Regions:
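Active-site loop/oxyanion-hole signature of alpha/beta-hydrolase fold enzymes
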Residues: 40, 49-90, 250
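Conserved HGGG/HGGXW glycine-rich cap/lid loop of the alpha/beta-hydrolase fold
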Residues: 9-61
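Short beta-strand/loop motif that positions the catalytic acidic residue
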Residues: 198, 204-206
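Short alpha-helix in the alpha/beta-hydrolase fold that links the catalytic acid
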Residues: 200, 214-223
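Acidic catalytic loop of the alpha/beta-hydrolase fold
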Residues: 209-213
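Conserved alpha/beta-hydrolase catalytic His-Asp/Glu region
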Residues: 124-125, 129, 142-197
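Catalytic active-site module of serine/aspartate enzymes centered on a nucleophile-bearing elbow/loop
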Residues: 228-262
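Flexible "cap/lid" loop of the alpha/beta hydrolase fold
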Residues: 97-105, 110-142
Length: 262
């Protein structure tokens, strides 16, 4: 574990492996430890960089910057600090809010974008309709975050994982429990017009049993992302990388081999 002080945040991160750089951006139920099933898989061919967003793990905002600084700005400064000019970004859920704006605004820095269970901060009528229809699921997840429950159904994984993989369900909740109370909020402000000149190779993946950000929402995001490809994973909830790591790693590996080979 390494801590660095940026202008707006102290960031907890880890670097493993060698080769072209991949940054893994976790979701709201995790932190840099969440990627324990991905880093060993990719570190022989890629430099794997994991970090915790401010207020997650051991990362924190400096001087209450969370109300005025976006996660994408933190990521850009983080990359600059590490002197990484070009990178592949792997975004899980909330991590899409971190990564998609960077791919839109600075395509020369982002070689490839892998969007897992996330529409990022995209807003379209279809995405907004799906988000509204799924508000109950989001509320359940919010309560789980706040209460830090470890022994009950965690919406970020899903009921199937709770039943079929109780040890994984427990581990996920234990990692989640390392996070701090969250004060920052995510903006939803990218429009289809903002995506008109988009040119970053992008794949969206979605679990067909996702109750947090459902497949209809992810499909709608893929539809307005030029050149994007959509993959659906059956019998899987919101956290494909955690529930079905072999499937996740194979999909990501195939994408990287084509767009960002080691």
């Amino acid at each position: 574990m390494t801590l660095i002080n940026l202008s707006s945040a102290t960031i907890d991160y880890e670097i493993e492996g060698q080769g072209p750089a991949i940054v893994f951006a976790h979701g709201a139920g995790g932190n840099r430890l969440s990627w324990w099933q991905q880093v060993p898989y990719f570190m022989d061919s890629y430099t794997c960089i994991t970090f915790s967003h401010p207020e997650f793990g051991r990362s924190s905002w400096i001087d209450d910057a969370g109300g005025r600084v976006e996660y994408s700005e933190v990521l850009l400064e983080f990359l600059d600090h590490l002197e990484i000019e070009r990178v592949a970004l792997v975004a899980q859920s909330m991590g899409g809010w971190t990564c998609l704006p960077l791919a839109v605004q600075m395509p020369d820095r982002v070689a490839a974008l892998f969007m897992a269970s996330t529409p990022g901060n995209l807003s379209t009528p279809e995405i907004d309709q799906a988000r509204e229809a799924n508000r109950e699921g989001l509320e359940r997840l919010r309560r789980a975050w706040e209460e830090r429950r470890t022994g009950s159904f965690n919406p970020a994984l899903g009921e199937r994982c709770s039943t079929d993989q109780p040890a994984m369900h427990y581990l996920y909740s234990a990692i989640q429990g390392l996070n701090q109370p969250r004060t920052s909020r995510l903006r939803i402000d990218l429009t289809p017009e903002d995506m008109s000149g988009y040119r970053t190779p992008t794949v969206y993946i979605t679990g067909e049993e996702d109750v947090v950000l459902p497949s209809s929402m992810i499909a709608a995001a893929a539809n307005v992302t030029p050149g994007a490809h959509l993959e659906r994973v059956p019998e899987t909830g919101h956290s494909i990388y955690f529930e079905r790591p072999d499937v996740f790693n194979n999909l990501l590996s195939g994408f990287l081999q084509h767009e960002y080979p080691a």
